[in-house]
Amino acid sequence: MSRRLYASLAVAAALTCSVYAQQPPAPAPQGGRGAAPCVTRPPVFFSEDWRQTPANDEHPVTQQSIGNASLEIKLYGSTAKEIQLTGTANNENNPTHVWTGLCSTPCALAFRHKTNYADLTGLARIRWNTKTSGFHQIRPIVKLADGTWLVGDRTDGSTRDWLVTEFNVADVRWLKLDIERIVTTGNIVERPDLSKVDEIGFVDLMPGSGHGAGGWSDVAQVDVFAASVPRTASTK
């Protein structure tokens, strides 16, 4: 190839680069039909870290064990009255918590907000601090506005130490829960309507073994992040 042709190609390339450099930058995408929707994470719907007595002793959990005045506590299972409150506030090695060791049958505990349902759709999530013994695990449970109870396939529980875990409710698969017997029924519930949830809590599907190592679940602080749906006068 001749030197004259090389020179011509170099000049052409330089002119092309100059033209592109003078062109204005493409405008940034504007919101509109093709724009991705804005995703908003829900606020704290409720937080509960329990309220211990001045004696700092072990005793059955009651409504007086709830520190959040907006919540009601609900106990389910034939021996749920044996769920104990124990631990000490601000003690990371033994925080104030509920303990299922004295439940001789499966037990469940749920929270009911006095003025609002929870909308557990979208990016709603649950966070809790738990510890277990043996093969015990805790699972989320919900009571829908129509009275249906569901239990999730999500399980938590570290036998080594207290562990804070958080999960998106949208990732959970659900079975119906017979709340009287605390047993699962039927097949996976496809696309349950979680837009209006009456109660939120947890269940240990195994009986407790009593004090000492063996089999039980501890649950300390519980946080739910969800939108609020006001209750009507008839549902408060």
Task: Enumerate the predicted regions with their spans.
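Beta-rich carbohydrate-recognition modules and glycan-binding surfaces
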Residues: 22-236
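Bacterial N-terminal signal peptides that target proteins for export
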Residues: 1-9
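Bacterial N-terminal signal peptides
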Residues: 8-18
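Residue-level detector of alpha-helical transmembrane segments in integral membrane proteins
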Residues: 2, 18-20
